[in-house]
């Protein structure tokens, strides 16, 4: 169905020359661009027409689902006759302030102003109301971005994490941008067999010069929708047929509202502390709400912990750090007692998760994957020329699906407590700190790499305190003499060798987080091809 050129048994075989005409220019590497991807800014009558499915020859193509592109409702005609692209809601959204709109999945909008970045001013065609909507909750009508199976800029490892989530059957699939070939896509499918059990296979979707798509030259399609329809009806050489699109989690918002995007010092009265989650040396962590309707985490700092002026200066930098493996800073109350408002992670700290929570039953593949997620977040911090200074499992938070995010980055530098600033005082995390940082205060991204090596031991030992049986002074002395922790029980030698690499005396000999991310993401798949050729493809 929708197949432009499907090979039947009696059909003549297509030549392979078409492959050579593909544009194989090298594309970006996933994760190197820290800037979120947005649609371009546009005015009411200058929105690019994402809904145009007409090929180079001007022939109208049939859109997936049998709707002809010439009659779809994705374009609103203005009085002057110009077309304005309509957007459709991909999720439900509940308004948080009087400035934004509540809406339901499937609702259509005309975009009035997109100059606010993550928040667009829009008019609902259902209610006629005008207000702000989060831009990552909508997509152009009839575009591939609006399809349930399209995940956009998603890396191979993250695709595998989502597809292997509990409850997805064999044949669950998604399509994402190719990491290696600009303009191409990847089809990722959950599969199962006796030898591997549940696993994911990836197929490259290539683009024809005339705008079509194919996995094999024997079956070419004018649209991705038609390709999905075809392989939903038959495996046709894939590991299995496409059964159901992977579930999309709600996209995260990097701001509480359009107003807090730039003015994010908020009144203390707008926050409600509901449940205390933890109590530390410098304050408490609460689950709470903002404006009575938005769940957040609130870190309250004891008065005197840090200078409000210094904190606000550092928070300006922290607010700009946006990555899906970093806990997002939303807002602050900068007068003492200082409140730090962040996204809420429902499984708590990685340390507690490993010692007393669901993490006790985790096997090595899950633990290595969690380490890879932390490395991915730290690789972003590395690219941004920032430093964490206090990387350990207590400062990693866990969410549903074993998602890990880095918290408290940058705060350690601001602490003014004498028991901490002495670096060898009772409150200082000596066992996680590189010797050059503990002894001489030389904190760099390479001292963070040392700490990451210690965090790896926490993962494989399910939260055991590093250097068991040794106090802080003994650890400092022994490490300076060259002592390194031995390989933990049941830890693979190759993983311990990575820890030792992180603990090199010379900081410059330690690996980068980019290397650590790649090593850990490919730890169990290094010997397998990244893309499947497919049977009979």
Curated annotation (Swiss-Prot):
ATP binds at residues 277-285, 299. Inhibited by phosphorylation of Tyr-531 by leukocyte common antigen and activated by dephosphorylation of this site. Coiled coil: none annotated. It is found in: Cytoplasm; Nucleus; Cell membrane; Perikaryon. CDD domains: PTKc_Fyn (cd05070), SH2_Src_Fyn_isoform_a_like (cd10418), SH3_Fyn_Yrk (cd12006). Residues 271-524 form the Protein kinase domain. Residues 14-35 are annotated as: Disordered. It comes from Bos taurus (Bovine). Its EC number is 2.7.10.2. Residues 82-143 form the SH3 domain. This is Tyrosine-protein kinase Fyn. The gene is FYN. Keywords: Adaptive immunity, ATP-binding, Cell membrane, Cytoplasm, Developmental protein, Immunity, Kinase, Lipoprotein, Manganese, Membrane, Metal-binding, Myristate, Nucleotide-binding, Nucleus, Palmitate, Phosphoprotein, Proto-oncogene, SH2 domain, SH3 domain, Transferase, Tyrosine-protein kinase. One of its GO terms (biological process) is neuron migration. A lipid is attached at residues 3, 6 (S-palmitoyl cysteine). The modification Phosphotyrosine is found at residues 185, 420, 531. The modification Phosphoserine is found at residues 21, 26.
């Amino acid at each position: 169905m929708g197949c432009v050129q499907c090979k039947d048994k009696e059909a003549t075989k297509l030549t392979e020359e078409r492959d050579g005409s593909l544009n194989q220019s090298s594309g970006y590497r996933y994760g190197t661009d820290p800037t979120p991807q947005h649609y371009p800014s546009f005015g009411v009558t200058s929105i690019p027409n994402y809904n145009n499915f007409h090929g180079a020859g001007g022939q109208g193509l049939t859109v997936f689902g049998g709707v002809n592109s010439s009659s779809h409702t994705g374009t609103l005609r203005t009085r002057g006759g110009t077309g304005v692209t309509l957007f459709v809601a991909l999720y439900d959204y509940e308004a948080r302030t009087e400035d934004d709109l509540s809406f339901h999945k499937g609702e259509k909008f005309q975009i009035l102003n997109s100059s606010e970045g993550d928040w667009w001013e829009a008019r609902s065609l259902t209610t006629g109301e005008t207000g702000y909507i989060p831009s990552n909750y909508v997509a152009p009508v009839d575009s591939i971005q609006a399809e349930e199976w399209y995940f956009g800029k998603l890396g191979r490892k993250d695709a595998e994490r989502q597809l292997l989530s509990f409850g997805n059957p064999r044949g669950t699939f998604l399509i994402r941008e190719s990491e290696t070939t600009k303009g191409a896509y990847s089809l990722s499918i959950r599969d199962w067999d006796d030898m591997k059990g549940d696993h994911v296979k990836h197929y490259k979707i290539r683009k024809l010069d005339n705008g079509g798509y194919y996995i094999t030259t024997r079956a070419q399609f004018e649209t991705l929708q038609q390709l999905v329809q075809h392989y939903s009806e038959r495996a046709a050489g894939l590991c299995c047929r496409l059964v159901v699109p992977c579930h999309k989690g709600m996209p995260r918002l990097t701001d509480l509202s359009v107003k807090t995007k730039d003015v994010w010092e908020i009144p203390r009265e707008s926050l409600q502390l509901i449940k205390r989650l933890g109590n530390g040396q410098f304050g408490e962590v609460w689950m709470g709400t903002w404006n009575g309707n938005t769940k957040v985490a609130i870190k309250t700092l004891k008065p005197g912990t840090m200078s409000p002026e210094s904190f606000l200066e550092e928070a300006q930098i922290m607010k700009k750090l946006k990555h899906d493996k970093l806990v997002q800073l939303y807002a602050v109350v900068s007068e003492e007692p200082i409140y730090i408002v962040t996204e809420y992670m429902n499984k708590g700290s990685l340390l507690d998760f490993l010692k007393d929570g669901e993490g006790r039953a985790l096997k090595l593949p899950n633990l290595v994957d969690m380490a890879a997620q932390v490395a991915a977040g730290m690789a972003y911090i590395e690219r941004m020329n920032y430093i964490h200074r206090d990387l350990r499992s207590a400062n990693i938070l866990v969410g549903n699906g074993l998602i890990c995010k880095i918290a408290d980055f940058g705060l350690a530098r601001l602490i003014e407590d004498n028991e901490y600033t002495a670096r060898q005082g009772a409150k200082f995390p000596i066992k996680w700190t590189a010797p050059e940082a503990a002894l001489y205060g030389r904190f760099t991204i390479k001292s963070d790499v040392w700490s990451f090596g210690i965090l790896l031991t926490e993962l494989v030992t399910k939260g055991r305190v590093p250097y068991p049986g040794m106090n802080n002074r003994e650890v400092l002395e022994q490490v300076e003499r060259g002592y390194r922790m031995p390989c933990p029980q049941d830890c693979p030698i190759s993983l311990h060798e990575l820890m030792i690499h992180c603990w090199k005396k010379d900081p410059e000999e330690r690996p980068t987080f980019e290397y650590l991310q790649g090593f850990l993401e490919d730890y169990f798949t290094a010997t397998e091809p990244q893309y499947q050729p497919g049977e009979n493809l």
